[in-house]
Amino acid sequence: MSDSSTLCQIAERHGVDLQQVQPLDLEGRIEQLRSCLLRTDVPYPVSADRARDYLDCARRGTAFSVGSLSAEQLDLGQYQAEQFYDRYSLEEHLSWACLIADQQRTKSRYACQAYLDGEAMFAIGGMTIPDFYLLNARIYQQTGWQLATVSMIIPAELFFTCHSRRFFPVTTFMRKLEQDYLQEPDIGHDVAGHVATFTIPVVAQVMQNHGIARNLIYQRRDEMLDATSEQQQRQSILNKADELLLYAERIYWFTVEFGLVMQQAELRAFGAGILSSPGETRYSIDSVKPTRLRIDPSRDCDLLRLATTDYLISEYQKTYFVTEHFDLLQSLTPERIVATAKIAARLPHFSWRDVAPGDTLVNLGESSISTNEKYFRLMCNQPADECVTRTAIRNLRILSSGPGNTVDLAGHWRAPLAPVPESVVDWFRREDQQGKFAQQTIRPLSFD
């Protein structure tokens, strides 16, 4: 544990009064929860019976695990965790307070107004880590969603099963002091990033629709598995389902997690992955490094652009997609998400640096490349990041697979892609037949 002098210095750097970082005791938290549960002027009032049982659990000091204010139930199995609120240290509460202070400075400038309104509704901007009993009650009353605590990053199948039932998985650990970007989510990401988006009705519906879409993919996968006992066929079915899940996940990533929206002719962020990181919040709007592309998700070609574009999980994004207004997201029904994923499986893909013909540019990023440049880099053995290389191999393997497997690209994009020279395709075919490009060409699901 850091000494008090160090903690005071850290707090001062972030504009936080360390004396205000004082969590309420159990009695104070219970009084807040009791007042909350009594409210009837909300979209989803809590029944008297459920409110009584919920309050009793909190009063006994039972650790919070899965919200119990609706009839929906959820089994997290080995991934279930609990929030033992009184075990958080002063350092952890200070880390929250510093993150919130930093976020508030950037969110007020860069977040869309609908997000800011939602954050104010849930009173997230406090000086201490939220008690999930109270936060869950507030979220449920306003949106019908609830929290479910998890111990680690959970499998994609479970993550989106939660979504389909209007549960959102949240971790219980808090990042270290002054740590900005995380590869795995903490309370700062899950709560200070995602929770406000539940109050944007169309975004909350898109999240649930992704859960339902994945259920459709799982259902079809399981039906096909039941119809065969041949091991190779079963593995092929599993691989195909995972591939479809990845393409659906990309749509989720570029909207719910890292989406930008226009607000009074200015760029604003609504993606939780952006807004949970003060550094990426500024970067996503102001930096000249990433490419920003305007899309209309109600158009099939633009939704395919999302599904066929790779993304980064270890650093700030190289490409962001900008939606004109939230209403355009209403078209992301479960059936349309699945149909788009199936088409994406047959098409060439884009790396996170690619700018394609027909893309509507907000700005061109410093590290952007044309769609064909990755093929020439591969052919000439020029430096390229793993995504550029992986995407080039995948696309060339499709294009070189023979006349019987020729890909029909007509009508899938806003404008035709530049044709890949036959000399490049012929070169790749020879090299691939000799086993030069054996590496994986589909990145694993990031929610695993």
What do the predicted segments below correspond to?
Residues N136, E223-A272:
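Extended, Lys/Arg-enriched charged tracts that mediate electrostatic binding to polyanionic substrates
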Residues H163, E230, R234, P278-R282:
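Short amphipathic alpha-helical patches
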Residues D242, Y247-G259, S276-P278, V407, ...:
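Extended, compositionally biased low-complexity polar/Lys-Gly-rich tracts
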Residues V195, T199-N239, L260:
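Non-heme Fe(II) oxygenase catalytic core, chiefly the N-lobe of the double-stranded beta-helix
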Residues M1-L216, K318-D448:
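The feature captures two recurrent sequence modes
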